[in-house]
Amino acid sequence: DIGKNIQTIRYANKLTQDQVIAKLNLMGISMSKSTYAKLETNRMNIKVSELVALAKIFHTDINAFFSGLL
């Protein structure tokens, strides 16, 4: 699932949730820790703008978030 892929990519980048949230906030995407946690556990839908920002933060292609879904 997308949330698990986001978490896996975050771990691979050796970033904490707080670090990712800080980077998102600097990019103009306001997000709380609880909201981010919901994204990683698929309890909340992610916006395309958030996926694009995460791809930049993780230095990866947006398609990486969809790995194993098809």
Residue ranges: model-predicted function:
Residues 47-64:
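DNA major-groove recognition helix of helix-turn-helix/homeodomain DNA-binding modules
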Residues 15-38:
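Short alpha-helical DNA-recognition segment
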Residues 9, 23, 39, 68:
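Residues in the recognition helix of alpha-helical DNA-binding motifs
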Residues 64-70:
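Short amphipathic recognition helices of helix-turn-helix/homeodomain-type DNA-binding modules
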Residues 10, 21, 25, 55:
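The alpha-helix within a helix-turn-helix
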Residues 1-13:
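A short, Lys/Arg-rich alpha-helix, primarily the initiator
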Residues 6, 17, 33, 48-51:
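Helix-turn-helix DNA-binding elements, focusing on the entry/boundary residues of the two helices
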